[in-house]
Each structure stands twice: as C-alpha cells, then as structure tokens.
C-alpha cells in the first residue's frame, strides 16, 4: 500500500506540474501585453497653425508613421513644408462634420475636387496596416481605390467603417483641442465651414528617435 501511495503521489505531482505549465503558457507575459498596447512608430512630425475667420485658434502637431507608410508620409511632409513649390500653407479645411471628421488638403480648388500629390495627380493606396482607432487619427481622403492626392482628414471619433478603404498615416499628438474647435465651427448644408478654416502656416519637426504610440 505504501509503494502504491508513493506512486500515486508521484503521478499527481507530475500532473500538477504539467497543468501548471499549461496555465503558465496560456497567460500572456509582460511583453505580449505590452505589444498589444504598442502602436506604430512616429518617425517625423508636422505642424499646422490654424485660423478660423480672423481668429488664430492654435497649433496641431501630427506624428507620422514613416516606417509603416513611407510614401504617404513623404507626400504629407513635402506638402507641409512646400518644398516642391506647392502645398498646404494657406489652404482650407473645406469639409467639417461633427462627430465624424474634418477634411482639408485641397490647395488647388479649395472645395474638395482638387489637390495633387508630389508623385503626380494621384498615387496608389500604400497599405491598410493601420486603422481608424479613434479620435485624432489622420488618413488620406480619396475618390475610390488608388486615388490618393493631397486631401486628408482627421477623425474626431472612431471610424472603423473606413478601415481598409483609406490609408491611415498619422495621429494628432498635440492640439486635439484645436481640432475640436474646428469640428465645432458652424457649417452650411454641404458641410462647408461658414468661416474659412485656414492653415496659415505648416512645416516639419524632426524626431531624433522614433517612438511608438498607443493605438487607443
């Protein structure tokens, strides 16, 4: 009986070790949990100084994801600096929809029918790795597949129905309160602001070391 009990104890002990190992494997480690929180890396920043009517409302700073969507980011940065001889400076946010987004980037016509990229009139969708996770994400406006130009929008809510259709390439790091001011401006029946919302200045801010941001 003693030998049988010892054997049973060994079997039970081995089973406990196996079960414990399985439970340990199923539990997410710190690195897994952290990976879920980590989002894309900001490689460069761009700023917009905005004005509504005659009133200066502040600066918006965007973090852009140059490793994830390099071509899209290069386009946005070049248009912000004006290094190609054209770009966002003095252009308008022509479309504002509360609880959805604010849209700008049409520096040729100012009504949502124009704009152009540094690669030509239009360029293809780079990828859809990033999603419209919530307020403050910056994405390319388009007229369908592979029709990216210079127009973009900033979300003011989560817009998951746009995932896989619009290329996300940045996020507001500073000045979300300024975005909210634009979102709250009065518009006409076609969502055009009654007072011009103008990018009075724009430019590039270097990032010494890329850093990840949360997807929330």
From Swiss-Prot:
The modification N6-succinyllysine is found at residues 84, 209. One of its GO terms (cellular component) is perinuclear region of cytoplasm. Gene3D superfamilies: Cyclophilin-like (2.40.100.10). Its EC number is 5.2.1.8. The keyword Endoplasmic reticulum applies. Interacts with DYM. Interacts with CALR, CLGN and CANX. Part of a large chaperone multiprotein complex comprising DNAJB11, HSP90B1, HSPA5, HYOU, PDIA2, PDIA4, PDIA6, PPIB, SDF2L1, UGGT1 and very small amounts of ERP29, but not, or at very low levels, CALR nor CANX. This is Peptidyl-prolyl cis-trans isomerase B. It comes from Mus musculus (Mouse).
């Amino acid at each position: 009986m003693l030998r049988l009990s010892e054997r049973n104890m060994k079997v039970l002990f081995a089973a406990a070790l196996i079960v414990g190992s399985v439970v340990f494997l199923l539990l997410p480690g710190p690195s897994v949990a952290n990976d879920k929180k980590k989002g894309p890396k900001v490689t460069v920043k761009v700023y917009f100084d905005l004005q509504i009517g005659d009133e200066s409302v502040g600066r918006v700073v965007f973090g852009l994801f140059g490793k994830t969507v390099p071509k899209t980011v290069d386009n946005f940065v070049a248009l912000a600096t004006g290094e190609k001889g054209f770009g966002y400076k003095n252009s308008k946010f022509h479309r504002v929809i509360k609880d959805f987004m604010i849209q700008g980037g049409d520096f040729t016509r100012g009504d949502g029918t124009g704009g152009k990229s540094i690669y030509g009139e239009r360029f293809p969708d780079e990828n859809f790795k990033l999603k419209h996770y919530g307020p403050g994400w910056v994405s390319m406006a388009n007229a369908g597949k592979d029709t990216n130009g210079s127009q973009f929008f900033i979300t003011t809510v989560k817009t998951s129905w746009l995932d896989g259709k619009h290329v996300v390439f940045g996020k507001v790091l500073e000045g979300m309160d300024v975005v909210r001011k634009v979102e709250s401006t009065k518009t006409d029946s076609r969502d055009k602001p009654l007072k011009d919302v103008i990018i009075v200045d724009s430019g590039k801010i270097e990032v010494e070391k890329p850093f990840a941001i949360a997807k929330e």
